């Protein structure tokens, strides 16, 4: 973010708020595309940040949609529903029926269990509608299915309405081991080849969530580009013959986000300087932060000449856990100053404990050089959600 460019604009809005810069979003997608090449598809996991899906529609190939709520957001945004992959560990019969009734065979569905397969079988047969599915291979948790069950489904796959497109696999986020990526892709490549060798089943699509890392903290070594390029090389070595689609959320969205909060109080307790801001940990989420010890990149807006001093930045929640960062050096920090936390484009706006203490939800702004600022969501009161609806 160019601090000077936004210096005036951000003072027009009441803190706390988020800014999602869609120019930065587009740059990140272009960087990913440039490394991977034209043959690899991009699937955006919208749980990372649903507010930017319309801005991504023309630059990604598909959207991973994991709940009825996310599905409704896609409809409201006017997303091409042919780009939707209906995922999620829990699928209800009525949700599948709705999707089939309204969108026919446009959507791809993931199969996470035998009951998912049975639900999709029942719905497609009832509605006489062909559907396409991906079978999710488990990585050793509650998601997906064992290899043996996938083999069983593939072996008996003859079905009038269900077409198995391929395999889906995801094992975690913030991976910093090239070897782990290589081993996972080698395992998947071998599994896909075995499905063809053993059952004559060609895997047309492999959807893989690489979990590439975002460098959030100043003291971390930035390995984003190294991991991306290593992933691209590993994909080129695959031999199963189908299309590879990379499911990404954090790696696409994180760089575009900024969380802006204001200093509302300052004090010194037992020799430590505390700065209270009007936001808090319920609105800010950095994966890997440990007891506020790690230092994210923070811009101090309108900082002035004066003494540099370490401040522990705390939010407005009535809990000792509401510490955003400890002993961060600011120059002449004063009440009313605005602090901009960077790389908050993924999960901060959606994953925080936003209803705690009935604090208002922050405003969300979408920015681009072409359109300037757009309000995607105003400040919203949460107290109405935390008591009986009268």
Model-flagged regions — what are they?
Residues 1-93, 329-342, 346-348, 354:
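N-terminal capping/small domains of soluble enzymes
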Residues 29, 185-192, 228, 232:
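Short, hydrophobic/amphipathic alpha-helical packing segments
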Residues 37, 41-205:
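Active-site-proximal beta-alpha core segment in soluble small-molecule metabolic enzymes
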Residues 171-173, 206-215, 248-251:
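Glycine-rich beta-strand-to-loop/alpha-helix junction loops that act as flexible
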Residues 177-183, 215-228, 254-265, 326-329:
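Short glycine/threonine-rich loop-to-helix capping motif typified by GTGT followed
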Residues 201-203, 225-239, 325-340:
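Acidic/histidine-enriched ion/cofactor-binding microenvironments in catalytic or ligand-binding pockets
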Residues 243-390:
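Charged (often Lys/Glu-rich) extended helix/loop segments that serve as interaction or gating elements
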